[in-house]
Amino acid sequence: MAINLDDKKAIVAEVQEAANGAHSVVIADARGVAVEAITVLRKQARENGVWMKVVRNTLARRAVEGTEFECVSDVFKGPSLIAFSSDHPGAAARLFTDFAKANENFELKAAAFEGNAVDVNMLAKLPTYDEAISRLMSVMKEASAGKLARTFAAIRDQKEQEAA
């Protein structure tokens, strides 16, 4: 189906707007995946703050040109499903890797974060903000418990030396 020039410009502008407000991008090939499954994926994407769309390759290349995601423009071959994470850098990657496990025809092509092409699985393993805060708090809590134990050991050693 032919798209007129104004529609093409609108699509490029829409993708550029999503790219400019995003932390990361993930590109996948969804050939052979049922429409119902893609509909469920789109719903999950909206719930997780992920913007996704099937975009023609030339339009996608033009849209990411001049953005920090230009590093993945060479993977736009064949049908491309592009997803931008705006809330959390790993949201789209996590969503797509989980979906790929359930749908063998869903192929992850590439991902980019902070201007660099990265492994999709590495990006998916990034902790969310809440997970990172809880990890930091547990490390701080463990550190204070360790300090307390070392203090008790030092007091014990000091008393043993005084008794001797």
Swiss-Prot record:
Could you state a single Gene Ontology molecular function term? large ribosomal subunit rRNA binding
Q: Which NCBIfam families match?
A: PRK00099.1-1
Q: This chain belongs to which protein, by name?
A: Large ribosomal subunit protein uL10
Q: Name one GO cellular component term.
A: ribonucleoprotein complex
Question: What Pfam families does this protein map onto?
Answer: Ribosomal_L10
Q: Name one GO biological process term.
A: translation
SUPFAM superfamilies in UniProt: Ribosomal protein L10-like
Species for this entry: Colwellia psychrerythraea (strain 34H / ATCC BAA-681)
